Amino acid sequence: MLPRLLRRRAHRRETPAPARRRTRPAALAVLGAATLVLVGACADAGTGDQPQAAQNPPDLAQFYDQQLQWGPCADYAPTADDAQTYADPQFDCTRVTVPQDYARPGDGKTMQIALLRKKATGAKIGSLFADPGGPGASGTSFVARQASTWATNGLGDRFDLVGFDPRGTGASQPRIQCLTDAENDEERTKVFADPSPAGVAAAEADSRQFAERCTQRTGADVLANVGTRDVAKDMDVMRAAVGDQKMTYAGFSYGTELGTAYAEAFPQNVRALLLDGAIDPTQSTIDSTVKQNAGFQLAFDNFAKDCTSRPGCPLGTDPATATQAFQTVMRPLIDTPAQVSDGRVLSFSDAQTGVSQALYVSQLWPALQQGISQVANGNGDLLMRLADLYHERDDQGRYSNMLQAFQSISCVNQPALKEPSEALELATRADEAAPFRSTGRGPVGARDACAFWPVPPTSEPHTPKVDGLPPVVVVSVTGDPATPYQAGVDLAQQLNGSLIAVNGNQHTASLQGDACTDTLAIDYLVNLTLPPQGAECTLAPS
């Protein structure tokens, strides 16, 4: 039987896996104990229970003033695996109508944003909206799975817990759709490791085909309006539709990007923003990708130190040679995939995906050690299971649209790398930053699907302008592979916010059972009490 951790899902943003044609998210955030180290005195920002009324845009009155009809959630489950959870009567669901294009709110084209709610059990402050990241992850699924934890830590007493599926994702309508299940399976077998002109051309042809399929099956008009800035506007409509005067929000990983965008667009409507696993809005695609690859190499190196100290480590006994030993095991998969017991084969791409999934939390290091050992013996079962979780593929071979939404949203969130020289620079620097991911055949300077996207981006790297924003809190983990620690430091400065530094090896830390981080985060969300300057938590070792 697989370890319990391997049967859980969460969603976070990640950069391209090597030898793939498109960027991919990955995640498996888990819980850990923590200890608290505090420096300085608490600053109280007040309770904020009686905020001033928000001023809603008059041209959007039909959306801001809509009356929601809540009902059972069974039909909102984004995957078959979620069906039982969504059937729980403690949850109710609805869809909020928003304009497809906020520049043309009266043209009759709308989208339906799915919401899942667990009502507050005590003296209610308002709603706590939450997003787990991606982009492309289901916020309704996230809140449904976190509700039992949040119900016992004080949040469920004071807030309606509300998850939402950002436009194009999960149970929201219309959904982004690019690939069939069979096409998804086929894509995962492909490896683009040939740096020659012919190899680059093949990779780019695959990227172009993906962009064409997304356009044909979703529509360019939808793809043009799924960016972060659009979702931030949806969030304000949601706030008003549930009856809240101010926004209380917890965003994780890419969810911090949503929170930042909301802060820029509606600073006057913010009550509290908790942003954990920060995306730095000033970074370019190349810089953020390279830094994230460096973060994963650090996570691999930390894993290797642990593995080489244990008996039976497939990487040997010397952490200094662990990357080379890992490459020796993995690189043969480029030409000869490993067998999987269900009849599929584990490609080099899927193997790297499974490894990245396991690097998100140190609790998965024993499983990763076992998975690498299996591959060394021609067995791809465990790493394939990890890759399936990453791709949200169930046992019947059905996929959610998370990864397709990830690509589609990413392509409108930042300018594409349209020049071959830019693609080669990215591939070269990413290889250098994360040698454990390298094919050993040289960087493949192929442009990804965004270079062939049918619509232009709606955002670009910038320094956020947040005049009038109330105090916010940013959480950043020192050993976070997907959203490196420094990005949290930088975002806290950009938003004039408070930082909670967490020492540990995992992606995000708050509201997941970590006593130290949770104490600070919950006190902020409930009482608006800011953490002391220099607040620091240390996760207990796994």
Language model features: what each stretch is:
Residues 2-9, 13, 19-30, 42-192, ...:
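Catalytic-loop region of hydrolases
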Residues 37-41:
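C-terminal motif of bacterial Sec signal peptides marking the signal peptidase cleavage site
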Residues 61-62, 323-469, 513, 519:
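Alpha/beta-hydrolase fold active-site neighborhood
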Residues 177-191, 263-325, 370-395:
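A catalytic-pocket lid/entrance helix-loop region that shapes and gates access to the active site
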Residues 217, 232-246:
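Conserved acidic catalytic loop of the alpha/beta-hydrolase fold
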Residues 244-254:
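Alpha/beta-hydrolase fold nucleophile elbow
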Residues 468, 473-476:
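Short beta-strand/loop motif that positions the catalytic acidic residue
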Residues 481-486:
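Conserved alpha/beta-hydrolase "acid-adjacent" motif
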